Structure formats: C-alpha cells, structure tokens
C-alpha cells in the first residue's frame, strides 16, 4: 500500500526520511528502499541515518546488536563491487539508499518497505542555452507507481511517499520520452554511421523537436564529426556517413 505525507510535506527531506524509517521499523521486520535524486542526497541521508541509529548501525550486515541496521548506498558511480553489496546475504535489517537505478534497471532483493521523496535527476537539453542539464524534478505518476511496486514482493509491504496525494495527482502521468528532452547529437551520429538517412524523415515513435535536430547537426558539423548539415553527412564509398577511423 502507498501512503502520502500530510500537511508536513514541505519539511526537510532528511528529517522526513528518518521519521518514515522509524515508522516502518516499528511496523515489522524487512528491508527498506529509499529513493533519492543523486549521490550527494544519498551521502547526506546516509550520514544522518548512521548518526540517528547510533550503536544499532552495523557496516557489514551482521546482527551483532539487538535491532542492528545496515545502511547501503546504491548509485551508478559506485564500483561494481560496491554496487553488488545490495545482493549480499545479511542477517539484520538493511536500508538501501538508491537513485532511480533501482526503479527499473535492477531489482533490489528482499525489499518490504519503500520511502519515496518523489524526486529524480532528469536529463534535459536546453534549446536556448545549448546545454545538457540534470535538474532535480518531481517524478511522474508512472515512476511513483513503479517505485511503490518495489515493495511487498516478499511479504505485504508499505510505500510511504513524502508528498501529498494532491501533489501526486497533479503530476504528469508519464515521464517525457528521453528523445524529446536530450541532445540529439549522439543519435544523429549513430544514424549517420548506420546509413539510416535523414533524421527528419525517420519514423520515431515520438518525433523530436526540429530545433533539437538542427542543433545536433550543427554541433556535429562544427566539430567535424559529419560533413554536410543538409543531409547529416556525406556518404563515403563504403556507404557510411560519419567521419572517423576504426
């Protein structure tokens, strides 16, 4: 089941997470998955939880003290060995602090409870500034539902959203497709290399903004990756369109 925060949804995120952790630990045994927008949020929350847990915190997943809790971070910049910690056996409760890599990319085993502040870093390209950014934004309803679905796979679970039901209902149903919000330079270059023809004529499920296509072609032309902005590239004798060696 998913619960939403009431009038205190604007309170400090870390405080809200700690309060939710206390509530879920009182609800029964089981591991907790907390979704956070980025590495810094994870590190700040990890430090706060370790301080809050005090002597109950253990670093190796072994229940040497009553009510022992392990806190495990999970984000893409961690080494493969560090990311693999979430799959290792443990004998105490575990709190996993993860980016949205745990939303769809992998399944963290043993999760019974989820805490969702409702935020994520969403890649966006600005047609005005020509810069790719990673702003923190509210997730869509579909993403929120996906997150809530990560709990209760081993037993009846609880998902706590740190935002109101009205906030949830006001969010877009789905996350905007990536092709509509990121730089198309790499897509255009790959299409040219594969000889797929003009980008403007390709039958995308979600056709990109013509301005984004022009920006991508202009960038690739300026750095010499393709030859002609008119059709994306000049075809060589081998039928390939992009410059570059093997």
Predicted regions and their residues:
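P-loop NTPase motor module signature
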Residues: 1-246
